[in-house]
Curated annotation (Swiss-Prot):
Subunit note: Part of the 30S ribosomal subunit.
Protein name, entry field: Small ribosomal subunit protein uS10
PANTHER family on file: 30S RIBOSOMAL PROTEIN S10 FAMILY MEMBER
Entry's family note: Belongs to the universal ribosomal protein uS10 family.
GO cellular component annotations of the record: small ribosomal subunit
Lineage: Archaea, Methanobacteriati, Methanobacteriota, Methanomada group, Methanococci
Keywords: Ribonucleoprotein, Ribosomal protein
GO molecular function terms listed in the Swiss-Prot or TrEMBL record: structural constituent of ribosome; tRNA binding
InterPro entries to which the protein is assigned, alphabetical: Ribosomal_uS10 (IPR001848), Ribosomal_uS10_CS (IPR018268), Ribosomal_uS10_dom (IPR027486), Ribosomal_uS10_dom_sf (IPR036838), Ribosomal_uS10_euk/arc (IPR005729)
Organism annotation: Methanococcus vannielii (strain ATCC 35089 / DSM 1224 / JCM 13029 / OCM 148 / SB)
Amino acid sequence: MQKARIKLSSTKHEELDSVCNQIKAIAEKTGVDMAGPIPLPTKSLKITTRKSTDGEGSSSFDRWTMRVHKRVIDIEADERTMKHIMKVRIPDAVQIEIELRS
């Protein structure tokens, strides 16, 4: 039986968790084995910019942070289950990658 590894990433963890819950419900409904969702470490991307563009005045800075949340789900990939997973509505903020393994 083939296995599928589903990798999900997003900057909005609420939407990411809702997609994970939908996939989990599909796996329970179809009765296939599933491992996950496994939370991976959150990446923090930081950018510091100077507020004053002309170089005059005091040195004050803005700090911008973006957090990227990731989840991994391993699931048995039978045809019926994969069709249901492909029909799940994925928000724009969530990126999904499906890798099939034998």
